[in-house]
């Protein structure tokens, strides 16, 4: 009896955990996009966020303010180290994507596109970013 219940419950629990991890990854990616856009607007310099599918991390970079009078630099510098958006092997992204945010809040993809997918092998979530930075996560 216990074996029958375990045979049913364990696969269901694994699928539920995979679903939670996919939702968490979508939330992390969405939050990183929105937060990076707000930083670009607040600081007044361009920012980028790069999502790497192989390492399941994202890296934020900016053209830092320097000089007198203060001005944005002409090249991007990473802010801190890469941050995981998911657990390696659990959730995949396609394609790797880099989004650039202008101080006006506009978004342009420099690698990939404004739409990419996250998948856990069972289900998929599509992240769509509008040109003005609105983020929508959809499940097909």
Explain the meaning of each model-derived region.
Residues 1-13:
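N-terminal single-pass transmembrane signal-anchor helix
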Residues 5, 41, 65-68:
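Secretory pathway export signals and precursors
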Residues 15-47:
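Membrane-proximal N-terminal amphipathic helix
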Residues 46-103, 125-128, 136-140:
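Type IV pilin-like appendage domain
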Residues 52-57, 108-114:
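A short, compositionally biased
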Residues 109-140:
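Short, surface-exposed interaction loops/tails
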């Amino acid at each position: 009896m216990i074996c029958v219940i375990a045979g049913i419950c364990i696969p269901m629990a694994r699928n539920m955990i995979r679903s939670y991890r996919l939702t968490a990854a979508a939330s992390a990616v969405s939050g990183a996009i929105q937060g990076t856009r707000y930083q670009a607007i607040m600081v007044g310099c361009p920012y980028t966020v790069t999502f790497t599918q192989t390492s399941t991390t994202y890296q934020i970079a900016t053209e830092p303010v320097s000089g007198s009078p203060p001005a944005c630099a002409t090249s991007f510098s990473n802010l801190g180290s890469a941050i995981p958006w998911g657990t390696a092997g659990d959730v995949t992204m396609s394609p790797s994507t880099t989004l650039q945010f202008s101080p006006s809040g506009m978004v342009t993809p420099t690698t990939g596109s404004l739409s990419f997918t996250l998948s856990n092998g069972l289900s998929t979530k599509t992240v769509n970013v509008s040109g003005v930075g609105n983020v929508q996560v959809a499940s097909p």
